[in-house]
Amino acid sequence: MIKGVITGDLVHSTNIAAKWRQTVVNVLHKCVAEFLPLTFVKLEMYRGDSFQVVVDKPEYALAIAIALRAKLRAETPDKQEMWDARLAIGIGEIPFESDNIVTSDGEAFRLSGRSFDHIGKKRLIISTPWLNFNNEIELVTRFADDVITSWTAKQAMVVYLSMLFSNKLQKELAEDLCMTKQNFSYHWISARGQLILDYVKYFESLILKYIRQ
């Protein structure tokens, strides 16, 4: 079965104070849980600041990856270095999946792991078995990565809620955040929110197209 795997670690994790460590872990788990109505998804931490996520429906892997980064940035405490993660998405077959993610194996794990080994200063990369797909998605992923890395906490929260509750009006989401609609709209536009959502939808449709080939 083709699934998605996200391999990641926290950026500058040694700068995160001990009192915030559990909060960061909770943020990651809470974010992943938000997607359970769409797909089975499981997150497992290892080596303290590293983690892997398995996504049963691979078309949602990018949405989950962006949501993880958005949620981390949105929940960063005041006067702290912005929380973020480096994430490598791998899409492929997973013939063997054990109870523990880190002992599972398959194409998606290998693609994700190898990509993560070469992620360098990037914070989002995607690898699949399809060369044409990788070429089509690489440039727009670099652009999206640059946009996400520049988000403020408020911009990140606005995009995060818009991704999760696409059926809600901006006015309703603004009220949830105790913002005016104008303020919400300002953060949405400055975060390039619509472009990010379009990128996510493009990824979803492209993945499904290649899977069906």
Residue map of PLM features:
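Regulatory and interdomain segments flanking nucleotide-handling catalytic cores
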Residues: M1-Q213
